[in-house]
């Protein structure tokens, strides 16, 4: 492709609203442009990268036995109502009405549509297992779109769905697609980890996220320093043991703590270590109010609270609900004197506290010398806190460290969550009606492009891995007015294309500095500069990733490039 014919508008300045490198560079290099908040156009170079990621995805999905189809972006509300997600999915689901006032949603995901499709066509175990996938635009009304392609309102996604007669069949396909995902991200050149995850609004169990390691990631990964254990911080269980001290219990005492609300403030004011304080929080669990206790130096993990109750929705109670329940403000909450109808659950660590402190459910007061079970009753002690760095790894090997990650893929064992809700059944080999067992597997295709750009860049621009680069080679005649340079550049361009390489020829009448700056910004793997030594049959070859350059004779160029790109 000749650069003079390409629509690739570059920017010299970093856009003010672009916070992270991938967003900045994809805009500056002319790979995309923003149309509205969280909505982008892919320009020609960006589209080439997107298509290469798509191709890798398709190859690995088909190798894993999945078959491609395409479903509609507009989905009837009746399907979402049938599954129970029309209201529970929340405000991220974009809803609309047609001219006849019939309700629809723009597809945020396609479990309902695929389940409806398959239930009408697959009636026997003889047609199972079945794995179908699509690459389709998705829509989510993000409250705060940010980070370019990483959190947008419209994005390209590959979603696959598998249907099974037995759990063993699901396990087999899940493992196969887990490996396919690992192959996809490895072929894209990414540094990633597969981690144990929460299924969230999707439902089901046994789920893994594929996380690209990056400081700008919105998720925290907890991983072992000596084993391959890795989990989303929301899902990492705490296996710590707590020993109760033999300190004698003291008499409960209420003390004034004016204007002291946060644990750190109360701890300092009372000269008590944070690990002897009891942090009390009120959660709304499927409309039921529950008091949750953790140690003062720990944080409540709301996903674990949700899992304790098998709840659909868990959220912090409002100030008004807390005021009505306990007649106090958030900073004074405590478990002592709570109405017996209100359930109190606590993290394991709370049971080991002796002579601790807690809120007194009275503004400006706390209790000291608080002892669980003597001063208040707990209905259940369980794992309710976030794991911390330095904790023992849940697999028993090593200690936990944290890293940030960008989620690019997610695989779920949905089980019968959707098939039972939507009456998607089949006849088993005994002629009995059974619900279809399902799996779900998603990859953020456009998000993967951003993740690659986030991992592969330097101070001068993008540095694309060869598997996804828009072109393999960038040929730059320095002076297009020179017949020797222009002709040699065109000859190299043509010969490399004949060898199967994708080549970009900078045939613009621009200054050398502009051409080189754009070349660095685009980040193609190999740059061939045709300069003053063209008359001698010599060019300069530069490897973008390493910055290494060498003069090469034209007759040796193809072999030299082949060795770089092998």
Swiss-Prot record:
- Keywords, ordered alphabetically: Aminoacyl-tRNA synthetase, ATP-binding, Cytoplasm, Ligase, Nucleotide-binding, Protein biosynthesis
Keyword check for Cell division: no
Query: Where does the protein end up?
Result: Cytoplasm
Stated EC number for the protein is 6.1.1.15
Q: Name one Pfam family in it.
A: tRNA_edit
User: Which CDD domains does the entry link to?
Assistant: ProRS-INS (cd04334), ProRS_anticodon_short (cd00861), ProRS_core_prok (cd00779)
Recorded GO terms, molecular function?
A: aminoacyl-tRNA deacylase activity; ATP binding; catalytic activity, acting on a protein; proline-tRNA ligase activity; transferase activity
Q: Which GO biological process annotations does it have?
A: prolyl-tRNA aminoacylation
Q: Which PANTHER family match?
A: MITOCHONDRIAL RIBOSOME PROTEIN L39/PROLYL-TRNA LIGASE FAMILY MEMBER, PROLINE--TRNA LIGASE
NCBIfam families in UniProt: PRK09194.1, proS_fam_II
Record family assignment: Belongs to the class-II aminoacyl-tRNA synthetase family. ProS type 1 subfamily.
Please provide the record's free-text comment about the domains of this protein.
Consists of three domains: the N-terminal catalytic domain, the editing domain and the C-terminal anticodon-binding domain.
Task: Write the protein's name.
Answer: Proline--tRNA ligase 1
- Source organism: Bacillus thuringiensis subsp. konkukian (strain 97-27)
Gene this chain is encoded by: proS1
